[in-house]
Amino acid sequence: MAESHTLSSKIIHWSFVLLYGYGIVKQIDDLSQLEDTGLLLFEVMFASVFLALVIMRYLYMRRFETFLGAREPVPIVHTYLAKTVHAGMYLCLILLPLSGLMIAGLFTQGHTNEEGLVLGFVLGVHGFSADLSYVLIAIHVGAALFSRLKGDGIWASMVPVLKDTGPTNNSFIKSISSTEEKIYAKAEQFFASKKQ
């Protein structure tokens, strides 16, 4: 059978999913809520821990192949796309707590006008990072689900449930997968011709 992620990498991955989910659920609705010193301190501590964990997670997880568990060779274009999505997710997950800490710092320094240049910019970065993280995570989850449907082994290397036992026999999924492979092959030919 193909390689699988280690138990520690699975724990890090799924614990972080819970932490991210908690961060979304507990987010503040209005900047004026930061007038509550206890809430402000909690937000600063949460953002600091979140940031440290994102960086530690990145440093730990980068040692693993992008498609660990794949039973078949993965096209280079697919690898680059996946790495781009992963890099984007990490960038968003670093910008979220960083901009959150900047918002808290600006707020404590008296910058409470959300329309102000500096605070408005930082709030914009924070909101954009959150929105982009939703999109990139949705792409990541969608790709993982498609991997499970294809039965290519990638899902099984990280997800502890609904493990696949081999490639699918479903003709519809096979057709989509074949089209996907053709697109990757055309993209590789395109980029190879540009290098010449």
Predicted regions and their residues:
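Membrane-embedded alpha-helical bundles that constitute the cytochrome b-like, heme-associated redox core
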Residues: M1-Q196
